[in-house]
């Protein structure tokens, strides 16, 4: 769920009810029938949107004297939701970058037993790229600037040895001054090309249209190049206001990709370690690559050259984030001295996939302790 999507949405005036917030007695504002226990610091709530396991509202922060986004998450009934919540909190509390959404505050009950919800406070961003592309055609200048910021943020993420794995327009938040921040790290993973993540053509949780082909074709090999493929899909969508590979299911997704890129070369096929996948591709009719200029006749030729290097079938030949930033299309913004990297690689102390939801709840409680009143953050 995008952490701070477009403001508005019209929840109307929030009702108030007497209650006890996360450690603070007083009134509790209601948003669309949902109590938001975030007072007295955060008031004047307005509904923004909601996802599978939470609602987002804007609120006035009486300490910072500005409006913020508050994501109410109620994940504790489901292991998967607990896992994503913990992973996002762990990552975002350690990340500091202008193009990555940060966490300003976290509110929750003062005891583990009483904790039913978690409230994550973040910067309020007026819209996201998905909504923007629904409403207008972007100029080349806007496309260039947004792409630069996506890659600048991704350079930082990748330098921490983290894969986002779910880059798509709705996870790119934008404000009125065209600042862009990457959000939603619930599916993020440590980069580990040796780990066996998924079998041949099994369904994958991230949004299908932005998936790299190797995710569907290989049982191993999550590398940073999967995020570059997603950015290529996003660039194509900015150029045309429509998804470039809108597959209805994973085989259809592959057919969309090959219908534009053409059939993979023998060298590219040799990189596919899964023989079942390789045999499937070899059984398909031969397809010729479609020229990018034919698909995007009005687009900047440098943009199309970069697009070609991102949407390369073979992940070993795909451009890296550092190379993409240095591409001529982005030369007006490129500044390696102002493209910071993480201070140290990110590591998860443990693999979260196999932990029960009760243990994940304990870890979320511990991870959010620093925001409790009277708690000093450990050095």
Curated annotation (Swiss-Prot):
Summary of activators and inhibitors of this protein: Phosphorylated by MAP2K1/MEK1 and MAP2K2/MEK2 on Thr-202 and Tyr-204 in response to external stimuli like insulin or NGF. Both phosphorylations are required for activity. This phosphorylation causes dramatic conformational changes, which enable full activation and interaction of MAPK1/ERK2 with its substrates. Dephosphorylated and inactivated by DUSP3, DUSP6 and DUSP9.
Source organism per UniProt: Homo sapiens (Human)
Post-translation changes: Phosphorylated upon KIT and FLT3 signaling. Dually phosphorylated on Thr-202 and Tyr-204, which activates the enzyme. Ligand-activated ALK induces tyrosine phosphorylation. Dephosphorylated by PTPRJ at Tyr-204.
Predominant location category: cytoplasm
Annotated ATP binding sites: 48-56, 71
Summary of subunit composition and partner proteins: Binds both upstream activators and downstream substrates in multimolecular complexes. Found in a complex with at least BRAF, HRAS, MAP2K1/MEK1, MAPK3 and RGS14. Interacts with ADAM15, ARRB2, CANX, DAPK1 (via death domain), HSF4, IER3, MAP2K1/MEK1, MORG1, NISCH, and SGK1. Interacts with PEA15 and MKNK2. MKNK2 isoform 1 binding prevents from dephosphorylation and inactivation. Interacts with TPR. Interacts with CDKN2AIP. Interacts with HSF1 (via D domain and preferentially with hyperphosphorylated form); this interaction occurs upon heat shock. Interacts with CAVIN4.
Compartments it resides in: Cytoplasm; Nucleus; Membrane, Caveola; Cell junction, Focal adhesion
Protein family (similarity comment): Belongs to the protein kinase superfamily. CMGC Ser/Thr protein kinase family. MAP kinase subfamily.
Active site: 166 (proton acceptor)
Protein known as: Mitogen-activated protein kinase 3
GO-annotated molecular function: ATP binding; DNA-binding transcription factor binding; identical protein binding; MAP kinase activity; phosphatase binding; phosphotyrosine residue binding; protein serine kinase activity; protein serine/threonine kinase activity
Modified residues (Phosphotyrosine): 204
Classification via SUPFAM superfamilies: Protein kinase-like (PK-like)
Catalytic activities: L-seryl-[protein] + ATP = O-phospho-L-seryl-[protein] + ADP + H(+); L-threonyl-[protein] + ATP = O-phospho-L-threonyl-[protein] + ADP + H(+)
SMART domains: S_TKc
Residue positions, PTM N-acetylalanine: 2
Region spans: Disordered: 1-26
Motif (TXY): 202-204
Entry note about domains: The TXY motif contains the threonine and tyrosine residues whose phosphorylation activates the MAP kinases.
GO biological process: apoptotic process; Bergmann glial cell differentiation; BMP signaling pathway; cardiac neural crest cell development involved in heart development; cartilage development; caveolin-mediated endocytosis; cell surface receptor signaling pathway; cellular response to amino acid starvation
Gene: MAPK3
PROSITE patterns named among the record's database cross-references: MAPK, PROTEIN_KINASE_ATP, PROTEIN_KINASE_DOM, PROTEIN_KINASE_ST
């Amino acid at each position: 769920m995008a952490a701070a999507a477009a403001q508005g949405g019209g929840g109307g005036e929030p009702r108030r009810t007497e209650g006890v917030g996360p450690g603070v007695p007083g009134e509790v504002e209601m948003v669309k029938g949902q109590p938001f226990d975030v007072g007295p610091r955060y008031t004047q709530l307005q509904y923004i949107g909601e996802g599978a396991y939470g609602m987002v509202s804007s609120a006035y922060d009486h300490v910072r004297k500005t409006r913020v986004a508050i994501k109410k998450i109620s994940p504790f009934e489901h292991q998967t939701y607990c896992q994503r919540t913990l992973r996002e909190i762990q990552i975002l509390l350690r990340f500091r970058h202008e193009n990555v959404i940060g966490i300003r505050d976290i509110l929750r009950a003062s005891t583990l037993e009483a904790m039913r919800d978690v409230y994550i406070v973040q910067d309020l961003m007026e819209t996201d790229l998905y909504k923007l592309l629904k409403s207008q055609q972007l100029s080349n200048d806007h496309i260039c600037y947004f792409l630069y910021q996506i890659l600048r943020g991704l350079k930082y993420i990748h330098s921490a040895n983290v894969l986002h794995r779910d880059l798509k327009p709705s996870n790119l938040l934008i404000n009125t001054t065209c600042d862009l921040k990457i959000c939603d790290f619930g599916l993020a993973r440590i980069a580990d090309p040796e780990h066996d993540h998924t079998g041949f053509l099994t369904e994958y949780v991230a949004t299908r249209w932005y998936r790299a082909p190797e995710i569907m074709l290989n049982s191993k090999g999550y590398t940073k190049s999967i995020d570059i493929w997603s950015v290529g899909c996003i660039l194509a969508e900015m150029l045309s206001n429509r998804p470039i590979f809108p597959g209805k299911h994973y085989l259809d997704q592959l057919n969309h990709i090959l219908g534009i890129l053409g059939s993979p070369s023998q060298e590219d096929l040799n990189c596919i370690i899964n023989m079942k996948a390789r045999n499937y591709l070899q059984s398909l009719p031969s397809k010729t690559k479609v020229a990018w200029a034919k698909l995007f006749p009005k687009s900047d030729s440098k943009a199309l050259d970069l697009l070609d290097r991102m949407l390369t079938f073979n992940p070993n030949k795909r451009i890296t984030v550092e190379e993409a930033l240095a591409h001529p299309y982005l030369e007006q913004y490129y500044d390696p001295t102002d493209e910071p990297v993480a201070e140290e690689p990110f590591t998860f102390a443990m693999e979260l996939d196999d932990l029960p939801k009760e243990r994940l709840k304990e870890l979320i409680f511990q991870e959010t302790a620093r925001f409790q009143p009277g708690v000093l953050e450990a050095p």
